[in-house]
Amino acid sequence: MSLKIPKILVTGNGGLLSPYLIAAADIMGDVVATGRKSGDIECDLLNENEVKVLLRDLNPDWVVHAAGMTDVDGCENNPVKANESNYLTAKNIAQNLHNNAKLAFISTDQVYPDNIGPHKEKNVGPINVYGRTKYAGEQVILQHPGAIAIRTNLFGTSLTARRESFDDFVISNLRMKKEITLFTDVFFSPIHMKTLSKMVFDLLEGNYTGVINLGSRHGMSKAKFGMEVAKHVGVSTEPVTFGISDMIVGRAQRTHDLRLDVTLAEQGLGYIMQTLQ
């Protein structure tokens, strides 16, 4: 008897991560991508009736909810929109998805406080609107019996028009010999989007539930990461200057040390997370 091929719904089509998620989902099952104005099926996730119809008609086995507002400063300047994008969409999905389905929510490392990392999953304390609305989204998602909330930070080449990753920013500016400032006081544990996407589906297939950090082992400063990216692609770092994040006036507050403790991930996945070097 053949195993059932899962029907997979990926939200957030048109986002930075979506092409990688869709490619990984396509290996695992039959995938449908949705966005507000793009994707296989258009759906306004803020409209609960549209979400109900989508989930009823598609009847997915697995859902990866990757849609949301990720601009930290944009969220701070428009908290209502941030709440709608990061909490209300999650609520509409979680409360209308049948209980036998599995649900993964792409959250953020910005839920952690401005303390020294690496952060364990229980160490929550967001200091900006983005982190608070994503954490609210986690809370409602986790009311679904088969849910995972994935806290992460991404890198990798953007495959989405008009969307740029941090390493894209570094490479494109240095290739044009434009000066960039890399922060020495910000630390993180980014993971490549292709690797992350595979892990999302490994966790769903393995019936993992709860909150989990997915990131690189150990992590590093954004300054060091930017220099490593430049070295990897062979561009000159002459235009690089170094600074601290607090030198920029008017930005939303951000946690300085976003390094992730990936012990639970290694236990849940059964393998050691990669380092950045």
Ranges and model annotations:
Residues 45-85:
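NAD(P)H-binding glycine-rich loop region in Rossmannoid oxidoreductase-like domains
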Residues 5-27:
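N-terminal Rossmann NAD(P)H-binding glycine-rich loop of SDR-like oxidoreductase domains
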Residues 32-51:
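Adenosine-cofactor binding site in Rossmann-like domains, unifying the SAM/SAH pocket
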